[in-house]
């Protein structure tokens, strides 16, 4: 029985201004700035009901703290509010943010606090004197304001010196204190406000786990970049203030955490009492009216667009019996696009296959009608399954139907029929993930198929190009655990042994020792291969760029079991780091590899994985190009240990060490590097 399919309404928390429309990710991560004991007691001064209000509240509190140092706080607020100098106001806000954090960091030192108040008083006096007009010392540099700017630079230097003296030279303590004393307490207050409860100390200490894992990694990466910049370029008020401002965005990283709350855990909504009077129909609820869907499947091109309604020349949905309320059934982001799906029956064997080219399927709660034949199951009808007689034998998964490109008129006289290699195993493809933003369900495993040629009365296998198969979008209704999102995923059908494509599948990687079941993303590394012109540049780093290509080629596919993928990602990050500093350190460490047996064993493991890579031949061609155009193997026998292992894994005979095919054009006399100029021209030195 086909039932109405409705998307679940978004979860709305009491008092919240926005709706949570997407599914939250798995939230589990610790911020680098907050450790185990950092949130034992949380009691911040800034409180509010909404997470998104925190950055603005911090800025306002910082300005208030700075203006309190002046003689007339109201006059300072008026000057700041009425000013149109955007750059000047930004400079003051940056100074105020760092000033307030410095006050909190030096609360235990009266002497330091006195010095800070003095700096704040002088700074606010400059604001009053300047007036934040168009030509202001707080804005861009001007010759008329260079004396006032020198005073401001001196005050900023004093502020930084006070912070350094009271934090042991570690300015990162400011961001740590901000997270511990302000950010996490604010998150706790928002949770207590929205849920009408009081959090116990244990729950408060675990608030850091609410931050999205990917977002937390981004924050940690930005922290590392900030530390690196500070070491290279020194400190400045603007840089430190922007780093603190980044920490204030942490509450916004709780991506829809409330969406994970079960509906039965939410507060009971207040239901109004029914109005007095007789209840129509004896108080019984009217049965929902079924949706009649008439679908005409033709052998020509057809596409269905149900952004508001389904109405196409090839596929038509009749909603005359029932109006679909888009507030409950939102199809605005569900698109069924079969523009690239073709069925050509012109070359099929008439004796072995017989069916009509079109069928009419009608969906309702109790029946499925067809103009040509009665389908055996409601599931095959609701998913738009094509009978075996339409295009040969098409084996589909439990939730999706694929139509293959079999247009033989432009290829040859023999038709091509796509059949499944897993037809006898009964294995089905599972829906591994659902993207809530694009409303698309993604199949975790590709549909494996083989192309056969049909020649009159005999059928033979043949080598063919890769055929792109798109699963047929279906309503997916009446099936247990109904999937309401539309399926539109590209599936690669492996049909040939052409170089640079996938050879059968990734089964070769099952032989890689501890990483059994490891599969790689196909052709993802091609985007990282630079052009020949770029290789000729005098600043081109052939070694790091080539190792980057190998690192991308070794990126595990999502179909790899998670424990294997996680273990291999760790090995890949250690041996092929995406960081020039770490790569140089590893290269130096491998110069005496015999003293590091564990590292040597890991290198051998990675070499074995590279040896069994399904696109090894293509990677070997790229290595040859790097050697020929960028001088990758100029050192030959003296090539470093990491690069040597990678090349040995790709080129098993070791010919790269002395072979003429790997001679770089740079080794030839009279050949110089090419310089890439700004205007795109090239010249030789």
Curated annotation (Swiss-Prot):
The UniProt entry, under InterPro entries, shows: SipA_actin-bd_C_sf, SipA_C, SipA_chaperone-bd, SipA_N
**Keyword field:** Actin-binding, Secreted, Virulence
Instruction: List compositional bias (Basic and acidic residues) regions by residue number.
Output: 315-337
Report residue spans for region: Disordered: 265-386, 404-432, 494-514
| Actin-binding and polymerization: annotated segments | 497-669
Q: What is its main location?
A: secreted
Q: Where in the cell is it found?
A: Secreted
Q: Which Pfam families match?
A: SipA, SipA_2nd
Compositional bias annotation for Polar residues: 338-349, 369-383, 494-511
Q: Which SUPFAM superfamilies match?
A: Invasion protein A (SipA) , C-terminal actin binding domain, SipA N-terminal domain-like
* Compositionally biased spans, kind Low complexity: 291-304, 417-429
The Gene Ontology CC terms held by the record are:
extracellular region
Q: Name one GO molecular function term.
A: actin binding
Protein role: Actin-binding protein that interferes with host cell actin cytoskeleton. It stimulates actin polymerization and counteracts F-actin destabilizing proteins. Potentiates SipC activity; both are required for an efficient bacterial internalization. In vitro, forms a complex with host cell protein T-plastin increasing actin bundling. It inhibits ADF/cofilin-directed depolymerization both by preventing binding of ADF and cofilin and by displacing them from F-actin. Also protects F-actin from gelsolin-directed severing and reanneals gelsolin-severed F-actin fragments.
Note the NCBIfam families from the entry. Answer: PRK15376.1
Name of the protein in its database record: Cell invasion protein SipA
